[in-house]
Amino acid sequence: MRIAFFSAQPYEKEPFEKVNENYKHEIDYHESILNKKTAVLAEKAPVVCVFVNDKVDADTLKVLAKNGTKLIALRCAGFNNVDLKAAADNGITVVRVPAYSPYAVAEYTIGLLLSLNRKIHRAYVRVREDDFNLNGLLGHDLHGKTIGLLGTGRIGGLVAKCLKLGFGCEVLAHDIKPNKELEKFGIQFVEQQEVLAKADFLCLHCPLTPDTEHLVDEKLLASMKKGVKIINTSRGGLVDTKALVKAIESGQVGGCAMDVYEGERRLFYRDLSNEVIKDTTFQQLANFPNVLVTSHQAFFTAEALSAIAHTTLKNVSDFASQNNDPSVIVKN
């Protein structure tokens, strides 16, 4: 099938082309982010492949449907950027990659937590400038600290076990569906308020839905233990960034490490080093000394890219042969 591949990055082409040797699809790579204006690039393509920052809203879907698109193939797990009702109304099936490498994201979460706590990102910059002073780089032992987790799916579960068994942390978790297997490792499931009140570090591992958008808002931040450090490798929209900035300024939040940002569509996966970034909220956040921001790269391993390519192209082939698959979100 012909696939219009949006938000294409140079590092994606090799794994997709390698896997596609077995599937023989025709892939047209477009660097453009998908939206209602760029949707015309998918004309006569029955399949459109999108990533996290593509805007697959009702207006975009209407254009795609008019031009013959029958399948939206997400090459990611999250689908909050897709209007599922509009897809169904336009007769478009939606599939995703439910899991590619939970280890990649879990390991990166631990890396961010360690870097934030021990200020490794600041130490690296200092040494490059021949500044070997340790002032301002004091961290804390993780052993014995309380880690709070909101969400214990595949990724959250791996993070929980790593911190409990590997570092000797006390791990308190909250999930609408508690993972009983994790309790065997000494991980405690408690109410959300208890997690917030006791956590020295809070890791977010929940999906972005209408119910979880701005989950971390002014009220929630005020209810947390003073000086808490927050790590988010899930979705940027979980955090009200303006409220977070205020909480950092007041000292209520002691720092944060974020691989995602609610306004990342305008920033991430682009080289803006020679441009003026007009998002003042992001600029303010990123310039705090106790904040570490990376550009949505937690998933970014060779193994994950290969798995994403395999699942995405298999989803397309399954659609072509009308095979049912658990990757389907909206079926038409």
Curated annotation (Swiss-Prot):
It comes from the Eukaryota. One of its GO terms (cellular component) is nucleus. Its EC number is 1.1.1.-. Transmembrane segments: none annotated. The active site is at 235, 264, 296 (proton donor). NAD(+) binds at residues 154-155, 233-235, 259, 296-299. Pfam families: 2-Hacid_dh (PF00389), 2-Hacid_dh_C (PF02826). Belongs to the D-isomer specific 2-hydroxyacid dehydrogenase family. This is 2-hydroxyacid dehydrogenase homolog 1. It comes from Schizosaccharomyces pombe (strain 972 / ATCC 24843). The lineage of its organism: Eukaryota, Fungi, Dikarya, Ascomycota, Taphrinomycotina.
